[in-house]
Amino acid sequence: MVHGTGIDLVDIDRLEKILMKWDMSFLKKVFSPAEIEYCAKRAFPAIHYAARFAAKESFLKSLGMGIGMGIPLKDIEVRNDPLGRPVLNLYGKALEILEKRGITTVHVSLSHSRSQAGAVVILEGLKD
């Protein structure tokens, strides 16, 4: 049973300007060390940071929440499985809320164009 869906778009240029202005202080506040390492190794890191930021926002929206509503962004980590597909690893408050709501599966999809990155999150579980 679907428990929630979330979608978000991030303007890549806008995020790149934030990265240039705040540098590591922004990155360390929003992304895990593994996410920072992954994105930093890419030819265009801002695209990958933007997609991951969109996934974090999409996850929050799928819960009916937003930034600043109790789940730190670092509790939502975007990684890739062995086939390269994106997956969300959840920690702390994010995991606690999923367990409380009976959510057992989190689906995430990422995409980007030259100017925008987007993500969709779908939450599934057994309970109503």
From Swiss-Prot:
Residues the entry annotates as binding Mg(2+): D8, E57
Gene Ontology cellular component annotations, sorted alphabetically: cytoplasm
Cellular location(s): Cytoplasm
Swiss-Prot/TrEMBL cofactor(s): Mg(2+)
Keywords for this protein: Cytoplasm, Fatty acid biosynthesis, Fatty acid metabolism, Lipid biosynthesis, Lipid metabolism, Magnesium, Metal-binding, Transferase
EC number: 2.7.8.7
Superkingdom of the source species: Bacteria
Known catalytic reactions: apo-[ACP] + CoA = holo-[ACP] + adenosine 3',5'-bisphosphate + H(+)
Pfam families linked: ACPS
BP terms from Gene Ontology: fatty acid biosynthetic process
UniProt GO molecular function: holo-[acyl-carrier-protein] synthase activity; magnesium ion binding
Main localization of the protein described in the UniProt heading: cytoplasm
Residue ranges the record marks as coiled coil: none
HAMAP family: AcpS (MF_00101)
Function text: Transfers the 4'-phosphopantetheine moiety from coenzyme A to a Ser of acyl-carrier-protein.
Assigned protein family: Belongs to the P-Pant transferase superfamily. AcpS family.
Record's protein name: Holo-[acyl-carrier-protein] synthase
Encoding gene, per UniProt annotation: acpS
